[in-house]
C-alpha cells in the first residue's frame, strides 16, 4: 500500500476517536481541545495525502475511493454531533450547529456518496474528482468544525464577534454546499447521459 493510501486509511480509522472526543467535550475542555487538534491534523493530512499522491504518481483507484470516504465519514460524524445542544460545553447549552446547516450539508454528502454508487452501478464509471467549489466547500467545512470546537472559549472573550463569525461561516458553508451540490448533480447527469441512461 502506498504512503498516501496509508495516510488516508489512518484518517478513516481516527474518525471513531474524534467521535469519542467530541462526545466527551462537555465533561472537560481537554477533550474538546483534543478533538480540535485531531480535526486540524486530519484536515492537514487530507491535503497532504492528495499532494503526495500526485507528486509521487501514486494516484490509485482505491485511494480515489478511500479519500472521499474518509472526508465524508469525518464531516457527517462531526456535523451530526455538533448539532446536539450542549455537546461542547455545559456553560453554553444553546451552542450547537443549526439544523438548517446540518441538514443541508449531511444531505449533500449523502447525495454525493449514494449518487457516486448509483453511477458506478449503472455505467461502471467511478469519478471522484471534486470541483473547485467542492474543494472550497470541504475547506470551509473543516474551518467551521474547528470554529465550533473553539467557540466555547471564544464566546467568553468575544461573545458578539463569535456569534457573528459563526453565523457568517454557517452561511458560507451552506452556500458553497448548495452550489457544489448542483455542480455534482450536473456532472452526474452528464455521466448517466453518456452511458445511455
Could you tell me what each predicted segment is?
Residues 1-197:
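Alpha-helical transmembrane bundles and membrane-interface segments of multipass inner-membrane proteins
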Amino acid at each position: 500500500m502506498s504512503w498516501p493510501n496509508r495516510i488516508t486509511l489512518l484518517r478513516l480509522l481516527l474518525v471513531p476517536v474524534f467521535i469519542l472526543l467530541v462526545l466527551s467535550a462537555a465533561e472537560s475542555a481537554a477533550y474538546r481541545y483534543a478533538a480540535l487538534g485531531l480535526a486540524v491534523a486530519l484536515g492537514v493530512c487530507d491535503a497532504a495525502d492528495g499532494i503526495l499522491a500526485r507528486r509521487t504518481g501514486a494516484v490509485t483507484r482505491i485511494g480515489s475511493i478511500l479519500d472521499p470516504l474518509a472526508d465524508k465519514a469525518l464531516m457527517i460524524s462531526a456535523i451530526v454531533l455538533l448539532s446536539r445542544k450542549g455537546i461542547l460545553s455545559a456553560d453554553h447549552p444553546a451552542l450547537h450547529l443549526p439544523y438548517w446547516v446540518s441538514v443541508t450539508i449531511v444531505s449533500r454528502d449523502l447525495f454525493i456518496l449514494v449518487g457516486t454508487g448509483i453511477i458506478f452501478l449503472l455505467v461502471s464509471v467511478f469519478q471522484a474528482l471534486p470541483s473547485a467549489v467542492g474543494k472550497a466547500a470541504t475547506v470551509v467545512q473543516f474551518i467551521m468544525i474547528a470554529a465550533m470546537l473553539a467557540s466555547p472559549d471564544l464566546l467568553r472573550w468575544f461573545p458578539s464577534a463569535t456569534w457573528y463569525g459563526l453565523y457568517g461561516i454557517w452561511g458560507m458553508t451552506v452556500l458553497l454546499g448548495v452550489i457544489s451540490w448542483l455542480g455534482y448533480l450536473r456532472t452526474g447527469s452528464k455521466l448517466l447521459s453518456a452511458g445511455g441512461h
